[in-house]
Amino acid sequence: MFVRDHLPRRSHGVARTLPDQRELVAAFGGHPSDTGEDHPLVAWARALAALHRQRHCDPLAAAGIDCRRAELVATIDKWVVEQLLGKRPVDHLRAESLGATVDRMAAAHVHASHLLHTAEKVSDARVHAAWYRLALLADEWTDLITGGVRETVRGRRPA
């Protein structure tokens, strides 16, 4: 999980155009990119994670935060349409909202990180389950950007 060279460099250049799961997970944790240059999607991923952290700390501000998250999801999806869909044969990207996937990954990362830092034992089943869910979403991201189709143990994609 989250290995640097995990993504195959195929799928009509899409894998090279979009950040891989490792870059997104690093962004969710607030880490800078390896190259020092942020891909726009990495910057938006970092912003989504910050909004999820803010939402956790200030539940009364949830409505405004959720509106901003929706704006970022729409921005990501618009960027994908403008930058990728018109230029390359990437039909597999049309079926899913990449912005919504990044938002779900950001929420899962923030939740897993919170549990890791607040649980009495890091071996707590809830901590493991939260990180496992993030791994499933990271795999979903990889499948979306490479055109793969992966099923979970139960035969369905993670929510």
PLM regions and their residue ranges:
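Anionic, Ser/Thr-rich low-complexity intrinsically disordered regions
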Residues: 1-159
